Amino acid sequence: MAKTDVYSVMFEGGAITTTVTSSGASVKAWVDEVLSVHRRRLRDLIVGLDVEWRPLFGPGYSPTALLQLCVGRRCLVFQLLHADYIPAALKEFLADPDYRFVGVGVAADAARLWNDQGLNVANAVDLAEVAAEEMGRPDLRNAGLKAIASAVMGVDIDKPDAVRVGPWDNYYLSDQQIKYACIDAFVSFEVGRILLTGDN
């Protein structure tokens, strides 16, 4: 059965409203709200994007369990493996070339979404490339989100290994998983916003 819970995740002194859901209707409502709030500047919309899956310690393939999206202080954590359906609104949102979906290693995340769910991310922007270019730091091309967030935002993201390699396909996610999933997408959004708009 599809479920939706809304959490307030704290990061660097601010709250991020985080919708954790397996409901297609709730995903549509989240997308509709983002489009409504940002309707005057949709051509400049930046969206933090990340995915999670249960790591395999051996051969095989683990399907994408979560899709995380973040715009401003609104974050969506969509439990793909438990979803009742994938709404057309999400497909259209991801496929709109006007919106920039930002993340580290985002091309690989987009490929996973296409292979697993047939979701096309039309405009994926890799923050490692942008950070290296904008900051004149070629070393950031191979950096992870933690190092890039430190360089761009001056923040330290806590990424505990026990959570990172945890059971992302669980129906009930732990508070630590929700915080990790939300902050990854939020920080991707913030780094993208700073680098692409020059607005600190």
Which sequence ranges carry the predicted segments?
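A short alpha->loop->secondary-structure connector
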Residues: 117-125
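Short His-Asn-centered micro-motif
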Residues: 49-51, 78-81, 102-106
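Short acidic, Gly/Ser-rich segments with clustered Asp/Glu that frequently serve as metal-coordination loops
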Residues: 46, 51-61
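Short alpha-helix plus adjacent loop in nuclease-associated cores
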Residues: 128-150
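Short active-site oxyanion
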Residues: 96-101
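A short alpha/beta connector and helix-capping loop motif
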Residues: 57-74
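Acidic, Mg2+-coordinating catalytic module of metal-dependent nucleases/exonucleases
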Residues: 150-200
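N-terminal accessory regions of nucleic-acid-interacting proteins
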Residues: 1-45, 127, 200
